[in-house]
Amino acid sequence: DANKTYTKLQTVGDRLTPVVRMEIEKMIFENQMIVVAYVPELPKNQKPCYITQKGRYEGAFIRSGDGDRRLSPYEVDRLAEGAFQPHYDIEPVAAASIDDLNKNTLTAIIRRARDIFPRVFATLPDETILIQLGVLTKVDDRICPTLSGLLVAGIFPQRFFPRLEVVFTVYPGVSKTGNEKTGVRYLDSKEIVGSIPDMLVETLTMVQMRMNTGAVLEGALRKDVPDYPLIAVREAVANALQHRDYSPDGRGTHVEVNMYSDRLEITNPGGLFGSTTIESLGKEGISSSRNEYLSRLLTYTPFESGYVVENKGTGFMVIESSLAQALMPPPKIQNSLTFFKLTFEKRRRTMIEMSNRSWEVIDEAIIAELTSRGSCSIKELMAMSGLSRATMTSHIRKLVRTGKVEPTENARSPKQRYRVVRNDHD
């Protein structure tokens, strides 16, 4: 009965917290009266919506398939964070002391802070600066590290939080079930520990060791191309460690970096935070940070020739740009209340690689290189192409025989080089 349904729907929203005002109307569809209700999405700072009588943890549901699923307490808490700025990243780690922090890293952070904000920090004592930045805090008149301080400068943070680590795994197939024929579940697995800079370095090293690097012809002879651009991987792993969920419930879950035969996945606990959406990733505008103190500290924390992050909301732009430059598709994004995942497709072999470089393509590349450089020796052409001496010599002899290339010296000269034959009217 459309009229009864219409009447009942008008009061449903009153039984929810916050109260939901639906747009309800009756209309004719295929000669039948139906009721259409539009339920506007609540702002993030008002979620989750729940049945008032059942309470927040028992009365909040999410649509799943053809049914409804009650949200877990973890999911409810993550939604509730939309109403405030979490400060889990500066909670004190009372069991730790300043002796658990790397002195060189602390010195670098202090120096960086004084360089950026000399009027604020130039005359302050080192300890005061570390407190102001959220590296240290006071608990009952005792100085101890914060969670952020431990993460950026800790010698071994996993002593206090064993699961705040990266687990890197290489699987032989396209799923975690492994190879059913051989029974091999994974080819390599490693727990990566230490501070965020330490984990980032080791994770990148493991990815580089386990992925393939191909050589393709580009214009003139050879260009090395990895399965995954390391710049993109670095940004993805850094973002996972920077923006993951560090709430007490989230500290039992690690960051996963999984390499399959066809893709690389980077997964962190906790979905996108605040105003950030999948659609806004990689776009210019205001960005949100779940861990604002940690994010700022990472801009002061040394890493290779710079710092761990820029904290300017450009990380995803760098990922997309580096993949585009490698002629690879954008990353696949999966986002939920409980996790965020980026998937990079493995670089597909080029036509040249699959055909093992056709004879004609190599000839064209040699001519292009000789034209560009003026002349080259056999040894130089071998180094640029990766081809053997016998193969390169065969190509050069053919090009000489067909009148496209000529030697610059006598046949047996140790200084022999080759150049493109000039036309008489050039």
Q: PLM features: residue spans?
A:
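Short helix-coil-helix linker/hinge
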Residues: 357-365, 375
